[in-house]
């Protein structure tokens, strides 16, 4: 003979309610509003500052390289082109893959890859310079980053983004010269690398200005 068990009925009701809540949570999709504020100006400014500092010193030979100067250069290299690019790369890749806040801006994947990789390689170069260790192995590193620079140039050229394509043209020239400069101890190459770093740094500052004015003031600068 069956009888009404209020305790058991209460347990069943709690279980049913819990199951409904779990199913509702599983079905619920979290979405974030699309944002036009792509943070690439942060990476551009960081890299541009690094190129002014490292490129200017290599091009003009001022100040002369000493252990003290190299430590200062290493600190700037770690934080500006290193950390600011790495931060931008992680920001972009997270926004593209987890939260989809940048829409279908597919070339931004290339930007996220480049900012992350360049940022980490600046960490290594900055620390190498800070402790004043041998720079010759950087020539092998430059081969990989020459490939990455050519890849970025190709992607943004096909996307029709000429200003960013020009940045990757500068990067391609820098790493193409870096290879023989480091591996073959080509003395003139150091100043050529500094020259193209300095010129690319100026273009990066323009791109920083153009992006910031467009987003902050609704300007129409070419970028």
Ranges and model annotations:
Residues 47-54, 81-88, 118-125, 145-152, ...:
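Membrane-embedded alpha-helical transmembrane segments of multi-pass integral membrane proteins
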Residues 65-80, 130-147, 162-166, 183-202:
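Cytoplasm-facing juxtamembrane segments at the starts of transmembrane helices
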Residues 159-223:
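Terminal transmembrane helical module of multi-pass membrane proteins
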Residues 33-37, 104-108, 112:
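Short aromatic-rich membrane-water interface segments that cap or initiate transmembrane helices
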């Amino acid at each position: 003979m069956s009888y009404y068990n209020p305790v058991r009925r209460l347990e069943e009701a709690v279980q049913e309610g819990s199951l409904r809540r779990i199913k509702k949570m599983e079905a619920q999709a979290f979405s974030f509003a699309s944002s036009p504020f792509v943070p690439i100006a942060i990476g551009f400014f960081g890299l541009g500052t690094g190129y002014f500092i490292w490129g200017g010193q290599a091009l003009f030979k001022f100040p002369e390289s000493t252990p003290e100067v190299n430590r200062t250069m290493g600190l700037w290299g770690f934080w500006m082109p290193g950390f600011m690019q790495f931060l931008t790369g992680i920001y972009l890749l997270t926004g593209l893959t987890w939260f989809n806040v940048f829409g279908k801006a597919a070339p931004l994947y290339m930007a996220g890859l480049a900012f992350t990789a360049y940022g980490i390689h600046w960490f290594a170069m900055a620390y190498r310079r800070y402790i004043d260790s041998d720079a010759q192995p950087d020539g092998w590193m430059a081969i990989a980053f020459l490939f990455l620079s050519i890849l970025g140039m190709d992607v943004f050229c096909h996307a029709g983004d000429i200003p960013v394509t020009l940045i990757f043209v500068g990067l391609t020239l820098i790493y193409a010269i870096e290879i023989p400069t480091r591996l073959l101890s080509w003395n003139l190459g150091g100043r050529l690398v500094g020259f193209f770093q300095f010129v690319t740094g100026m273009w990066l500052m323009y791109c920083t200005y153009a992006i910031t004015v467009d987003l902050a003031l609704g300007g129409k600068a070419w970028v």
